[in-house]
Amino acid sequence: MSKKNSKNKAGSNTIALNRSARHEYFIEEKIEAGLSLQGWEVKSLRAGKANISEAYVIFRDGEAYLFGSSFLPLQAASSHVVCDPTRTRKLLLSRRELDKLESLIARQGYTVVPLALYWKQCWVKVEIGLVKGKKEHDKREDTKAREWDREKARIMKNKHRG
């Protein structure tokens, strides 16, 4: 059985990406967490109806929750269950990971945001990142570096065409 490495293509394991997080924050550390879901949410994730671009992680009573994500219910979803697309979903992390994240957020000004939502075998996983916010000049430097890398690749491509 071969692994699937494609991102957001047919047959991909990726459900949703938070592209703005890579632009807005310095990503210090990435952690994989499970997600506690209801049945209709799993069905909507299989259909790819998820958005995590405005989401972040909050800590309450020693537990971590994904706040601000939206999973749109399907039209054919069960009518006896009330579907709340923006409900807070519990993250499944070990006690050690929870304590570490909570202490870093409290002391050093870090934030925890979701970076990606994906399938791992039959389970839905969320990749969360321990991040610090970028200043405006940091964003500009990243943009300049990215544009220069593109320009270098373009020059090398034209040079080799010859």
Curated annotation (Swiss-Prot):
Family: Belongs to the SmpB family.
Compartments in which it is found: Cytoplasm
Free-text function comment from the UniProt entry: Required for rescue of stalled ribosomes mediated by trans-translation. Binds to transfer-messenger RNA (tmRNA), required for stable association of tmRNA with ribosomes. tmRNA and SmpB together mimic tRNA shape, replacing the anticodon stem-loop with SmpB. tmRNA is encoded by the ssrA gene; the 2 termini fold to resemble tRNA(Ala) and it encodes a 'tag peptide', a short internal open reading frame. During trans-translation Ala-aminoacylated tmRNA acts like a tRNA, entering the A-site of stalled ribosomes, displacing the stalled mRNA.
GO CC annotations, alphabetized: cytosol
NCBIfam families the UniProt entry points to: PRK05422.1, smpB
UniProt-recorded Gene Ontology molecular function terms: RNA binding
Protein name: SsrA-binding protein
Primary localization: cytoplasm
Region annotated Disordered, chain positions: 137-162
Matches recorded under CDD domains: SmpB
Keyword Protein transport: no
Signal peptide: none
GO biological process: trans-translation
Any single Pfam family the record assigns to this protein: SmpB
Biased composition (Basic and acidic residues): 137-154
